[in-house]
Amino acid sequence: NSKPPEALILVKXSQ
């Protein structure tokens, strides 16, 4: 995992 998953962060933030 070189870079953090933006999609995951976005979903987490959304919820």
UniProtKB/Swiss-Prot annotation:
The keyword Secreted applies. The keyword Secreted applies. It comes from Phaseolus vulgaris. The lineage of its organism: Eukaryota, Viridiplantae, Streptophyta, Embryophyta, Tracheophyta. It is found in: Secreted, Cell wall. This is 45 kDa cell wall protein. One of its GO terms (cellular component) is extracellular region. Its main location: secreted. It comes from the Eukaryota. Keywords: Cell wall, Secreted.
